[in-house]
Amino acid sequence: MIKKTPFFNKFLGFSILLFILVFSVRAQETPEQTDQTVLPRKFRQLSLGMNLDDLKEALIKDDYFHFRGDRDVSLLPIREQSLVETTGSSFIKRAFFQLRDGSVFIMAFTLNTEIIDHYSVFNQFSDKYGEPAYLDPKISVWETDETRISIERPLTIKYIDKTVFNDIINESGLIESGQVQRRQEFINEF
């Protein structure tokens, strides 16, 4: 039988207090862990889903970019798509914004590797959003149902609206399947 001494009572009391403290801290950490699954759809004042006029205004106001207005906007021959390409200052070398039906669905920022290294950016993302869903030496990807963020080597960060992007992929598959069918019909005529 264990003899209960004042030391034993202090040890038992300390153990119980430590146990309660550890579990109360863990309970407080739980919301932060669930927040890691929410990926940002925004960098500074630039966000997925914003319209072209708001994008141009935000780029003009942001000191990280050297936006030259409409000279940096190109219309793409693809359905209602346009591309905004601009240079950056210091940390950002170049930035690309692809719009469909007037809304941004891809933002890509090529960072200056003389100032910022891949490892630091990767660690920041991992600390904030957890481990990537996909990882290889060339790309790290974090994903939710709505958003995909990738860090690509040497150092480009891409934000993609997955809903719009998947619609484009599905449409291109339909176009391609129609072309395949017409091709086969043509070949069958011989």
Segment roles from a protein language model:
Residues 13-22:
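Bacterial N-terminal signal peptides
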